[in-house]
Amino acid sequence: MILRPYQEQMVSKAVAALKKHGDTLAVAPTGAGKTVLLSALAGRVGGKQLILQHRDELTFQNAKKYREVNPRARVGMFNADIKDWKGDATFAMVQTLCRDRALSTIPKLDLLVIDEAHHAVAPSYRKVVDAVRDKNPDCRIFGVTATPARGDGKGLRHIFSNCCDQLSLHSLIAMGFLVRPRTFVCTLEGTDDRLASLRKTASGEFDMNEAEAVLDMEVHNAAVVREWKKLASDRKTIVFASTVRHAEHAAEAFRAEGVNAAVVSGKTSSFERAALLRRFDEGDVQVLVNVAVLTEGYDSQPVSCVVLLRPCSFKSTMLQMIGRGLRTVDPARYPGVVKTDCVVMDFGRSLTTHRDLESKVRMEDKQKPCPECGAEIPCGVMECPICGHVFKGPGRAAPGEVGSDDPEVVSNVVMEEVDILTASPFRWCDVFGSGRVMLASGFEAWGAVCSADGERWLALGRL
């Protein structure tokens, strides 16, 4: 398999970082081909390897891609049914491997690869990492993730000593490897203030039962479908709902309008889930409503609409969800499917809360030390992927740099399209055409800059 240029660059940097610094993290947005990256890296490093995933279906999905990248490698599996360490690379789900009886079977390894590496400091992963290091203290660890910032605030320093590279979403869109998101902030009547005051659980996420109480009303579900039909009636769509009951009611609202919709959740059996995902990928189901099932690792390239029908207190969760719709389409795999962008409809205030889809990153060869944890990270990174330290940088975008459409009031929904790829979610307007009075209206506030007689005044207010 021939790697894309940015993949080749990242793999080369990762190999060099493993040799120089030891345990290494790489950050790439959803859709960058992280499985290809980790497979190519593992193939070049060689030795006895373990590739760790957090879901069973990802184990088989990643093993298949590994064979495509490394056709001569022997691949083994370790799960509930198969326990095979004979291959050059063994794929395992962490929940299976972290049990004491399974940990004792781990052989001496040369390389441990962790997919979705932001999970690496969780207790189940730490048990596997400790067992691997006990067998071979010199075993190298490589992790790849789209979202290094964990919701619980835990840094990754205990596992990784450096970040070899970080790809930006904007750069992959510019190169044509991801499609551009068209993002719409959709406010259902009477929900904005209630969503803004939701209680958070011990994990730091919003209470989804409270979110359900706000969003799961028949009139709201009908409004969601009505707005979806205006923007994405012909698009394959993934909907993220707050609870299973909410998902079922949302799917019913779609079906009431003649749209083939289905629900997948943690309660769906593995057999039924596989069948539903296959039907969705093949086009038999147009809208798939899910509850925390398709957030990570799921890949259906024709998806061109994502509906956030729930709030996200963690930016990483929002990024994973939106990333489901940003992949480009392989014409050989999906003949006749044309995809140029992805419509993102946010009914849960996530875009209002988090403002953008990434930290601003410049791709540079030079590294700098993080003053907080000492990790070596790319110079352009403004937030350390290892510990979360935030570097001081320039402020928000200057007036005139950002565009958005004027709000469109539709029945009981206020819908506003915003350019979420830019640093600021609002547009500056020249009130009198003289450049002396500039006014901007954002999601929740307004700002004005006035100039006269060589002096400048700034005014801010809350909407």
What are these regions (language model features)?
Residues 60, 75-85, 248-252, 259-295:
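Conserved helicase ATPase core of P-loop NTP-dependent helicases/translocases
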Residues 119-184:
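Post-DEXD/H (motif II) to motif III coupling segment of the RecA-like Helicase ATP-binding lobe
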Residues 282, 316, 326-428, 433-435, ...:
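C-terminal helicase lobe
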Residues 95-98, 266-361:
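Conserved RecA-like P-loop NTPase helicase motor core
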Residues 163-238:
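Conserved interdomain linker/interface between the two RecA-like ATPase lobes of SF2 helicase motors
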Residues 48-59, 210-257:
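Conserved strand-helix element at the start of the C-terminal RecA-like helicase core
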Residues 20-41, 240, 264:
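Walker A/P-loop
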Residues 1-27:
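Conserved pre-motif I regulatory segment
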